[in-house]
A protein has these predicted regions:
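Conserved non-catalytic scaffold segment of RNase H-like nuclease domains
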Residues: 1-83, 96-100, 104-118, 165
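Short secondary-structure capping/turn micro-motifs that flank functional sites
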Residues: 41, 89, 123-124
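Short Asp/Glu-rich motifs
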Residues: 44, 92, 126-127
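A short, structured active-site edge motif that brings together acidic residues
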Residues: 82-92
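Acidic, divalent-metal-coordinating active-site segment for phosphoryl/phosphodiester hydrolysis
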Residues: 119-132
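Acidic two-metal-ion nuclease catalytic site recognized across multiple nuclease folds
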Residues: 132-166
Length: 166
């Protein structure tokens, strides 16, 4: 995503070489048969790395996703050093009175598209929409409010403050 537009997408299943537990199958709709035909991570690692190496890595609960991806890429010889932004944390800052911050809940409350939660591509698209929604909200705030928020930005995870600063 760049300047509020999707400029590229990549989606692929990955063969985990083990059976999924029932919870994951129910949550995602992915089956063992589907993954058995998917490529190994080593086959797509370079493509993923090249797509994101010069980007800001944005995720809903970035700590989980970025660490998992960085570890998998490292095992394939790639070191992921992208700045990281967490939309959970941004939503907590700019919508402090919400009852929960699950992507599905935020999508419903903020009227974002999330056709099938817990599928990587749909979650990524909804996270992008959430980021743009939050950026619009930030842009609508008085400069004095943004400056005050930035005084507390050292408490944010990773480089999440970049969204507020820009």
């Amino acid at each position: 995503m760049q300047n509020g537009q999707v400029i590229d997408e990549f989606a692929s299943d990955v063969n985990p070489h083990q059976e999924l537990d029932d919870h994951i199958i129910h949550l995602t709709g992915i089956t063992d048969q589907q993954l058995a035909q998917a490529p190994d991570f080593s086959e797509i690692a370079r493509t993923i790395f090249e797509l994101i190496e010069d980007c800001i890595f944005v995720a809903h609960n970035v700590k989980f996703d970025a660490n998992l991806l960085a570890e998998a890429l490292f095992m394939e010889g790639f070191e992921l050093r992208t700045p990281r932004v967490d939309t959970v944390e941004l939503a907590q800052v700019f919508y402090p009175t919400l009852e929960q911050y699950k992507l599905s809940h935020l999508s419903k409350v903020l009227n974002l598209d999330l056709a099938q939660a817990h599928t990587a591509i749909e979650d990524a698209r909804a996270t992008g929409q959430l980021l743009f929604h939050l950026m619009d909200k930030i842009a609508s705030l008085p400069r004095q409010t943004i400056e005050m928020l930035l005084t507390f930005s050292d408490n944010l995870l990773f480089e999440t403050e970049l969204v507020i600063r820009d």
